[in-house]
Amino acid sequence: MTNKIDWQAFADATIDILVKPAIGDTVLIITDTEDQTELPVTCLKAALRAGADAQLLVKHHIDRKALSTPGPVLSDAILASKFIVDFCGGIVRAPATIEARSRGSRLLSTYVNDIEDYVNRALLNIDYEAMIRNADLVAKLWDNTNYCHVTSPQGTDINFKL
């Protein structure tokens, strides 16, 4: 992360709005040796302030496009965590992550390098609760629909059964 950004508000929003751990929930924050640690450490502090049982794990760097097979330490940490906050990639399709998610763990994965200003503004300048309300309304609409016909002024004309 090359820009000097105060990550405190971003970390607080990430933990308080997106992750929302209850007191005692396990939160694993993962970064790697190629990334700056300021944001992951700030998120760790925010998770601890929220009362979570939070840990920060720094793993070896793997190319973002490569499939990672984490070793036993990282795999066990992933499996033991209710919330996984990944800042470096390489674990989304890992067997431990897939198993953890099938058991109910939640994964928040992002890579902010080179887009720091954008992600900071994007998270801090939105009405997240309104987005959730709108998503719930759309979900309710889809749940009560058998057939959909979508058109737009740009020429979209799609029909499908649900």
Label each PLM-derived region with a short phrase:
Residues 1-162:
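Active-site bordering "gate/hinge" segments
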